Amino acid sequence: MLEFISRMLGKEPASKNVAKERLRLVLVHDRATISPHMLNQLKEDLIKVISNYMEIDEGALEVNLNQDDREVALIANIPVIKMKRDYSVKG
């Protein structure tokens, strides 16, 4: 919105700010780019850790990366079957 008003008033954004914004967009894109293998490994690691505390439906577990203009978010949908009363490490 401010950028629109600045343009209407004839003020151009400083080249420093334009370069900074472009770099930010490149970094966000890089962070969101993840190989299917790495995403699968992340999913397996989440299952290992969470399974120490609760019984989960591994088949219905969903892990995704979402990005908007400013950030990348890890979204995990993990159906819980039941909580474990005692902590136990499998393996």
Curated annotation (Swiss-Prot):
Keywords: Cell cycle, Cell division
InterPro entries: MinE, MinE_sf
Gene Ontology process terms (BP): cell division; regulation of division septum assembly
Source organism superkingdom: Bacteria
A Pfam entry, by short name: MinE
Function: Prevents the cell division inhibition by proteins MinC and MinD at internal division sites while permitting inhibition at polar sites. This ensures cell division at the proper site by restricting the formation of a division septum at the midpoint of the long axis of the cell.
HAMAP family listed in its UniProt record: MinE
Protein family per UniProt: Belongs to the MinE family.
Official protein name in the record: Cell division topological specificity factor
